[in-house]
Structure formats: structure tokens, C-alpha cells
Amino acid sequence: MEQYEKVEKIGEGTYGVVYKARDRVTDETIALKKIRLEQEDEGVPSTAIREISLLKEMQHRNIVRLQDVVHSEKRLYLVFEYLDLDLKKHMDSSPEFVKDPRQVKMFLYQILCGIAYCHSHRVLHRDLKPQNLLIDRRTNSLKLADFGLARAFGIPVRTFTHEVVTLWYRAPEILLGSRHYSTPVDVWSVGCLFAEMVNRRPLFPGDSEIDELFKIFRILGTPNEETWPGVTALPDFKSTFPKWPPKDLATMVPNLDAAGLNLLSSMLSLDPSKRITARIAVEHEYFKDIKFVP
């Protein structure tokens, strides 16, 4: 650890404290994530090993880079590139952001590129939210951070833990108790982020699982076997749910053009099997005017 000098604590991560720090060798500013090991008799928690193994494989311009792993008997530190701005802070502090549809488009494109890359490596993110989308102020490039809850998924998709995605960005199949979800859960979250960037407020700000579901159904309509085959068999589906008709998405996201609305509605399909994939979404006509040099 002699190589790294802590500068200040910048937050509490899923598994421990995050510090801003300096690399004494290169003089580079880095983010140091300290993983708590005290409760673990076996040493390094499997959650951290999973995060490390995933992140070491993840080499992409839109993924936060894991630079080093420092391990001692009682401590585990992950060394990441340092970015001090996240999408939540950026939206809160930049009133001009909402007036710049190109900026929204550029950010959305980069989120989708990062997610498409993850999915191509059989990795779900599962915890997408504005706080873990980091922005490089100099280049305006956006990177996905915090793979704390991600895990590699094989085919067939295994049963996953229930608590993964922050409520406002949580896909309806998870809210309805599905144990066999896959990559569409991330695409749903990206759709929620897209609408939030355009509207400057969350689309489905539920304060409980049922409130979240009902906020979704009030806008997109209550699903049934016709619109989502198999939905009534999900563990938490109730035949007593109010039967709301779908609203026109254009009234909910009025500042979005036709191509944007088409993309958004294909990301917010209630039936996960009908949801667009990240790989196909990056080719959508909404992005046709983007000249993005990799």
C-alpha cells in the first residue's frame, strides 16, 4: 500500500469505503476502494473476488478501469481510475443539460456501448443508476462504474438474488418475482435513465416494490397474458392488480423526438423478450447523426 497515499474519503461503496488517493510512483490521482474483510473468516469475500475477476476482463472505453489490486491479510484495496463527476451530480448541477438533446444522445450512446460490451462478455450490470455512471469532465466521456452486484451469467440463466437494481430503475420482471432474468433488466434500467435525462426527473420514482410496479403500470398499462405471455405465472403477479390502460409515451416524455420515442418504447417493453438489446439499440436511427470516434 506504500505506493498509494489517501487524499480524502469520497464515499461509502457497496462493500466498503472509497477514497480519493495519489499514486506516489506516477503522481496520478486514483480511486481506492477498500473492501471490508473483518467479518470474513476465509479472507477475501467472494463478492470482491467476483468483482475483481469481472473488472479485470472488462477493458472498454465506457467501463471504469480497474488498475490494480492490493491484498493483505485483513485488507483488500481495488485501485480504479479516478472520475469525480457522476450523472446524478451532472444533471443536478447543469440546468443547460436538459436543453442539449445532443448531450443526452451522446451519454445514452455511451451507456449502451458499455452495456452491449458487458452483455457480449456474458456479464449483467444489474445496478445501473445515475450515481454509478461516471463522467470525465475533460472529454465528456461516460463510464459505467460499480460492478458490485454484477456476476457473470451462463446459459441457461441461473437464479439470482432478489435485491439488485435500485428501485426506480428496477425491471418489472424482477419486481414480479422472476428468478430467471437476464440482459433485458439492464436495458430497462437504461430506458429509465434515458427518460430521466430528457425530463430531468425519474420516470418511475416508486417508494416500495408495489408502488414502483403501479407507477410503471399506470404509464405502460397493466400487463396480461396477451401483452406479456407468462406474466400471470410470475410469483408476485396478482389478478387483483388494477387494470390500467397504456398511456401515450409522448405525453410522458414530451421533449423527445419521434426516433427517440421509438427507441425509448422499445427499451421499456414490459415483456423482457420483446425489449430491444443493447447491441441493436446502438444501431438505432436515433443515433444516426452521431459521429463518434472510438
UniProtKB/Swiss-Prot annotation:
Q: Where's the Protein kinase domain?
A: 4-287
Keyword terms of this UniProt record: ATP-binding, Cell cycle, Cell division, Kinase, Mitosis, Nucleotide-binding, Phosphoprotein, Serine/threonine-protein kinase, Transferase
Q: Where are the transmembrane segments?
A: none
> GO CC annotations?
cyclin-dependent protein kinase holoenzyme complex; cytoplasm; nucleus
- Which residues does the record give as ATP binding sites? 10-18, 33
Q: Record keywords: ATP-binding included? A: yes
* Active site (UniProt): 127 (proton acceptor)
Superkingdom in the source lineage: Eukaryota
Query: Is NAD included in the keywords of this UniProt record?
Result: no
Q: So what does this thing catalyse?
A: L-seryl-[protein] + ATP = O-phospho-L-seryl-[protein] + ADP + H(+); L-threonyl-[protein] + ATP = O-phospho-L-threonyl-[protein] + ADP + H(+); [DNA-directed RNA polymerase] + ATP = phospho-[DNA-directed RNA polymerase] + ADP + H(+)
- List, alphabetically, the InterPro entries matched: CDK (IPR050108), Kinase-like_dom_sf (IPR011009), Prot_kinase_dom (IPR000719), Protein_kinase_ATP_BS (IPR017441), Ser/Thr_kinase_AS (IPR008271)
Q: What are the Phosphothreonine sites (modified residues) in this protein?
A: 14, 161
- Disulfide bridge partners, by residue number: none
Task: Give the regulation of activity.
Answer: Phosphorylation at Thr-14 or Tyr-15 inactivates the enzyme, while phosphorylation at Thr-161 activates it.
| Pfam families from the UniProt entry | Pkinase
Q: Which EC class heads this enzyme's classification?
A: transferase
What would you give as a GO molecular function for this chain, any one?
Answer: protein serine kinase activity
Q: Which residues carry this modification: Phosphotyrosine?
A: 15
* EC number(s) from the headed UniProt entry: 2.7.11.22, 2.7.11.23
Please give the CDD domains that the UniProt record associates with this protein.
STKc_CDK1_CdkB_like
Q: Which GO terms describe its biological process?
A: cell division; G1/S transition of mitotic cell cycle; regulation of G2/M transition of mitotic cell cycle; regulation of meiotic cell cycle; signal transduction
- Family, per entry: Belongs to the protein kinase superfamily. CMGC Ser/Thr protein kinase family. CDC2/CDKX subfamily.
Query: What does the record give as the function of this protein?
Result: Plays a key role in the control of the eukaryotic cell cycle. Component of the kinase complex that phosphorylates the repetitive C-terminus of RNA polymerase II.
Q: What name does UniProt use for this protein?
A: Cell division control protein 2 homolog
